[in-house]
Amino acid sequence: MIRQGRWLGIVSAVLLAVCLAFSKGGDAIPAVRAVGDLDGDGKPEEYSLAGHSLTVTEGGQVIWRSAGDWRVDSFALGDVNNDGTDDLALSLWKTGSFGTLRPFWQTGEDTSYKNHLFVFKLQEDTFKSVWCSSDLDCPIVSFAIRDVDGDGRSELVVEEGQYRRIAGERYALALDSPLRTAVWQWEEWGFRLRRLD
């Protein structure tokens, strides 16, 4: 009985640590790896997400790493903008939406820490931004790039949650929030909502 109680205590402590790490934005996610050839040069790139940082290598050389102030929680490879070549899509958390160039209605510094979706294209071993969202109304829980309706065009299928305020303008995913599925499709410059379940 003492051994069972001890193991139950250890398991409970581990589960508590994992839950706390997730709720505080910790690095509790396991490493995720993928292989793709986004630039079509016949040399596959390796994508590795570990410790909320995404690293891309080709032939053992690092060709790209996510910015140090981004907290990347997931990524997908696929033709999200339907131009015939695969893209890198990232769900990430960062401070601010606009950087140094701001729209006219944004008068002060944007210090909110929220979820964003960024899309990159790989050309000649250089990642170029295709689309970088402002902070999202609903944070991404998970997402995939696939043809949902059979029309031959990819959609971005997103499971969305809700934010919870941590402190000031810093937010995290509310783990107990209801989820909804949104289906988005690329149109010219950005995504248009096709369906919300």
At which residue positions do the language-model features occur?
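Beta-propeller-forming repeat regions
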Residues: 2-197
